[in-house]
């Protein structure tokens, strides 16, 4: 009896360790609180056991120091970090930057020794005060002149985290969000250098295609499509992962991005297949209210009465209804992506974003909260 109990305990421990071997890094966006009705998401809606890391987006920089962005950020910081009372193993990070912050503001700070130093010194006390375990740098689309400065910023930030931890506290984590487009990578990131100083890199393997193009196409294909033009041969997760690994990123520090949103188009003709001409972005979702983007829970509504298709080569679905075309991810495609990243021995998966998944479980017909993120977790936890 005692031996059987011991064996059972050992098996449970092994399963826990196999699950913990992969990171599931999940972003939460503070502006999701402003969506109407069932689209409004606050940090207390998050299952504290769903992800290994939750990243709060975004912090601001004021007078070269890290700062809050929203009027109630401090309250939301506290709500998020209270989740660790229920799951002490959960790690939380604060992401600084983002799309609206812009690359030029980062450039000005990182290119000058004094402003860079001021910013770096401001980070540890801010993170400690608000209960975060680390910082995520979301310097998106740095320019050619920024490549060296970004590397210096990462190197000096890590050195500051090491120095600060000498007081006996657990060392703060440092991660970065990195664009997955080949042109953006070549222009702005010294992958081999920054990898040395980061705990993990979140590769943004989505937004490969959008309304800025003249034709329909999936924004987050796993593999290259057989009919892809030569210009699109780089626009898939498999190429991006392989390229970043080739540039020197260790597989055990690379986290592959998986979106819980889709990109939509308004068709310009009766053609509905991939490569069909478009007149612009798709109509805004009822909750997210942004042209060309739909949350997964909005896509579940859209699928009622829509015609669905699946790219067998790219391993992702799309749907059409009237003059609307939506490329998205479903449970099957995110599972395939999770299996893929395991086969490449990557560090894990990143989800953008928890508040775009069906976080209430009200929309996608399964009475399951976070269906996409949960599907990823199931694959990562499997032996």
UniProtKB/Swiss-Prot annotation:
**GO cellular component terms, semicolon-separated:** cytoplasm; endoplasmic reticulum; extracellular region; extracellular space; perinuclear region of cytoplasm
List the molecular function annotations (GO) for this entry: carbohydrate binding; chitin binding
Q: Does the keyword Lipid biosynthesis apply?
A: no
Q: In which tissues is it expressed?
A: Detected in smooth muscle cells in atherosclerotic plaques. Detected in regions of vascular occlusion in the aorta.
Q: Where in the cell is it found?
A: Secreted, Extracellular space; Cytoplasm; Cytoplasm, Perinuclear region; Endoplasmic reticulum
State the residue spans of region: Important for AKT1 activation and IL8 production: 324-338
Return the SUPFAM superfamilies for the record: (Trans)glycosidases, Chitinase insertion domain
Q: What does this protein do?
A: Carbohydrate-binding lectin with a preference for chitin. Has no chitinase activity. May play a role in tissue remodeling and in the capacity of cells to respond to and cope with changes in their environment. Plays a role in T-helper cell type 2 (Th2) inflammatory response and IL-13-induced inflammation, regulating allergen sensitization, inflammatory cell apoptosis, dendritic cell accumulation and M2 macrophage differentiation. Facilitates invasion of pathogenic enteric bacteria into colonic mucosa and lymphoid organs.
Please identify the protein, giving its name as recorded.
Answer: Chitinase-3-like protein 1
Q: Which organism is it from?
A: Sus scrofa
Which gene is this protein's source?
CHI3L1
């Amino acid at each position: 009896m005692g031996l059987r109990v011991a064996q059972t305990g050992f098996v449970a421990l092994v399963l826990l360790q196999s699950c913990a071997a992969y990171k599931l890094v999940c972003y939460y966006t503070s502006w999701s609180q402003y969506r109407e009705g069932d689209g409004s998401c606050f940090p207390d809606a998050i299952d504290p056991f769903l992800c290994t890391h939750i990243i709060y987006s975004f912090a601001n920089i004021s007078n070269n120091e890290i700062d809050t962005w929203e009027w109630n950020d401090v309250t939301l910081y506290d709500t998020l970090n209270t989740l660790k009372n229920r799951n002490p193993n959960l790690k939380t990070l604060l992401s600084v930057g983002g799309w609206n912050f812009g690359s030029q503001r980062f450039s000005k700070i990182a290119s000058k020794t004094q402003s860079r130093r001021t910013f770096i010194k401001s980070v540890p006390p801010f993170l400690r005060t608000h209960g975060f375990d680390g910082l995520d740098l979301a310097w998106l689309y740095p320019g050619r002149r920024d490549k060296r400065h970004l590397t210096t910023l990462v190197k000096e930030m890590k050195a500051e985290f090491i120095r600060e931890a000498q007081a006996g506290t657990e060392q703060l984590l440092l991660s970065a969000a990195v664009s997955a487009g080949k042109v953006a990578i070549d222009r702005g990131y010294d992958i081999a250098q920054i990898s040395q100083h980061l705990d993990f890199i979140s590769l943004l393997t989505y937004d490969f295609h959008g309304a800025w193009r003249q034709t329909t196409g999936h924004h987050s294909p796993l593999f290259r499509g057989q009919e892809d033009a030569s210009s699109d041969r780089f626009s898939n997760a498999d190429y991006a992962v392989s390229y970043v690994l080739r540039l020197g990123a260790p597989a055990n520090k690379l986290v592959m991005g998986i979106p819980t949103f889709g990109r939509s188009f308004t068709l310009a003709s009766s053609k509905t297949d991939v490569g069909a001409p478009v007149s612009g972005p798709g109509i805004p979702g009822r909750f997210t209210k942004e042209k060309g983007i739909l949350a997964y829970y909005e896509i579940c509504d859209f699928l009622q009465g829509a015609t669905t298709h699946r790219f067998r080569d790219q391993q992702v679905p799309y749907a059409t209804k009237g003059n609307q075309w939506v490329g998205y991810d479903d449970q099957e495609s995110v599972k395939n992506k999770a299996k893929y990243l395991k086969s490449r021995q990557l560090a894990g998966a990143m989800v953008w974003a928890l508040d775009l998944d069906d976080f209430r479980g009200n929309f996608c017909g399964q009475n399951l909260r976070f269906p996409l993120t949960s599907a990823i977790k199931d694959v990562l936890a499997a032996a």
